[in-house]
Amino acid sequence: MDLYYEVNGNGHPVVLLTGGADVRNWTFVANLLAKHYKVVAFDLRGTGKSPSSLEDVNHVEDLLSLLDHLEINQATLIGHSMGGQIATEFALNYPERILKLVLLAPGLSGFSYSKEFEENMKKIHEAAPDIDRMIELLLSDPSYRVVTVSPHRNLMVQMLRHHMKRMFEWPAVKLIWPQPPAIERLGELTAKTLLIIGKEDSPDNLRVANYFRKHSDARIIEIAGADHMVNLTHPETLYRQITGFMKE
């Protein structure tokens, strides 16, 4: 297994999946969950301390390989942002490996994002390789309005800077997602699912949450005063919601 991972605590396995960051994204939540569970946090391929790939990247199959390597037959997945997208795809393709599913402001394969979102992403990409400018543009998005004025701003900037440096190292590979996309299969989710999102997150991410509300049996919880980085700014709230859900 060449992916970087950390394991803390004992009990039922809980696997944490991040998006555009690294295991530091879970610093506060992981420490709380490790009181009661075996917590596995890992860096996706090409991020954090995990190696890049010379071939197309399939995060779903990477997760399967990690679970097999750790001899985890069944786990609860907690995914943030794109990590939530990966967790959803995994739950649809390997339902027997999932006990419960927790999604924090998740992405969704096949979802049509707004023109405004696409234009913002284009501006960020056009600013490359000026990492400071890319970070400035990204954090100017309203979905980061809470974390940027919190004590966790510096951690956020550090993770983004490291992530973007890693991105420039990637060879020309693409991400492989299962087909058909999850948006067409949400009704097939069998794992009991909790979706948590900050009320100050972006309109697009709130639309994703609403899509889950309409097309799956997921329980939706909106947290007041939280943005896209609810895992950094509201770890105690997440801990209470997640542990309550897992005890059901």
Regions found by a protein language model. Give the residues of each.
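Conserved HGGG/HGGXW glycine-rich cap/lid loop of the alpha/beta-hydrolase fold
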Residues: L3-K49
